[in-house]
Amino acid sequence: MANIGFYAGSFSPVTRGHLGIVCEALNDYQKVIVGVGINDSKQQLYSLDERCEMINAALDDLLFEYEYRDLVGYRFSRSEEKAVCRLRENRGCVEIVGYRDLTVDCALRSGA
């Protein structure tokens, strides 16, 4: 059985802090599922699809920044370096799923 972590949020928008948590989770789990929730009681700036795309783009940016870290001047922590290496080897170690039901139901469906 795979060791799967689940990280839920609205990610409206995704931040550097969110990516830091994903990186930390990648050091503890074989796979990390990022659950993007829909909360009807909150006014969302971006649609579910846009938020999922933003997370993918942020992960791409993280890989790019790591590749060119000497040029961009961003310092990576050891856990970020480890996580980026995992992402470069296997982008499938992070899966992004949208959901509108209970977080626990999405986590269970995802195998976390």
Q: Where does each model-flagged region fall?
A:
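Nucleotidyltransferase catalytic core that binds NTPs
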Residues: 1-112
